Amino acid sequence: MSTTSEAVQSKYSEAGVDIDKGNAFVEGIKDIVASTHKNGVIDNIGGFSAHIAIDVTKYPKPVIVNSTDGVGTKLAIAHMCNKHDTIGIDLVAMCVNDLIVGGATPLSFLDYFAVGKLDIEVATEVVKGIAEGCKQAGCSLVGGETAEMPGLYQGSDYDLAGFVTGIVDRDSIIDGSDVRSGNKIIGLASSGVHSNGYSLVRKICFDDNDYSVEDHIEELGSTLGEELLKPTRIYVQQVLNVIKNYPIHGMVHNTGGGFIDNIPRILPKGYKATLQAGSWDVPAIFTFLEEKGKVPREEMYRTFNMGVGLLVIVAEDKAEDILHHFEALGEKASIIGEIQKQTDENDERVTILPEG
């Protein structure tokens, strides 16, 4: 039997898939994965599925919430810098931030890692980042899939996808239905570009201007690679803390599409958002990209987060208290706009007033 098995493995290895290396990788990350587990996880790392016991007494009308996302071509920057220990944080952030804006608490996370040829060291660094992201979000990394696919991916090139499951009581879902005219919009600062718009970022920096990730950019105070690999901020714990204490009418994860495309996703029919430019700090990386790429400001607002990673819509009389609560939790926050009624159906859903 062993001789036959070895022969089969040899043929599979010749085809570019190393089962033994894959098994060694899974064995090597077990402690990393287990370090994220919280109460309720029934440990079975390497099994066929993951099991979580849920205390539904906390949720009279429990609703399971799911979200999935990736990190796009930010992966190319990780390869250029040969730095793979933070891209997993981005992966978790993109998923859990989408989940939290609906008021849900993240419970478990799964990842999908597809690669041409498995490099255990690189893959382990990626998983370390995913585990760190899960710890920041307070959810458990309960499993994943590592797929070695020669012919579809070249060499060490890899792609990532993440899947998060959360829970919320039906009566506590935040869906924008309570948004009204006069509500204030609080913006929570981003760490930089986060994980959207990197195809344009790479074109501006490396195709049109011939920069290297190793170039030190004075206005950024770092190398270009260091700036572009800053992990996406995870807002879960801060938001969960606030929604326990205050009513929140709506939230927006400011990702691809920026303010222009994302805010309308939470607005009831007949309402619009007006933002005031200058009411929040725009990180230097966006000015750099705008100038080097000659990108119109309107396109910047529709492509990047422009310094605001999450928007929180609240009643006017609660806005200052909620703002200060976020600040007490360590968030850099500011009131950046308000909700208004549309004057007619052709009225823009999002308007950004110029500074001054």
Swiss-Prot record:
Entry keywords, A to Z: ATP-binding, Cytoplasm, Ligase, Nucleotide-binding, Purine biosynthesis
Ligase among keywords: yes
HAMAP family named in the record: AIRS
Database matches in Pfam families: AIRS, AIRS_C
Enzyme class, spelled out: ligase
Catalytically driven reaction(s): 2-formamido-N(1)-(5-O-phospho-beta-D-ribosyl)acetamidine + ATP = 5-amino-1-(5-phospho-beta-D-ribosyl)imidazole + ADP + phosphate + H(+)
Organism from which the protein derives: Desulfotalea psychrophila (strain LSv54 / DSM 12343)
Gene field: purM
Pathway in which the depicted protein is active: Purine metabolism; IMP biosynthesis via de novo pathway; 5-amino-1-(5-phospho-D-ribosyl)imidazole from N(2)-formyl-N(1)-(5-phospho-D-ribosyl)glycinamide: step 2/2
EC number(s) recorded for this UniProt protein: 6.3.3.1
Protein name: Phosphoribosylformylglycinamidine cyclo-ligase
GO MF annotation: an example: ATP binding
Compartmental location: Cytoplasm
Main location: cytoplasm
Disulfide bonds listed in the record: none
Any Gene Ontology CC annotation: cytosol
One of the GO BP terms on file: 'de novo' IMP biosynthetic process
Top-level taxon: Bacteria
Family in the record: Belongs to the AIR synthase family.
Annotated Gene3D superfamilies: PurM-like C-terminal domain, PurM-like, N-terminal domain
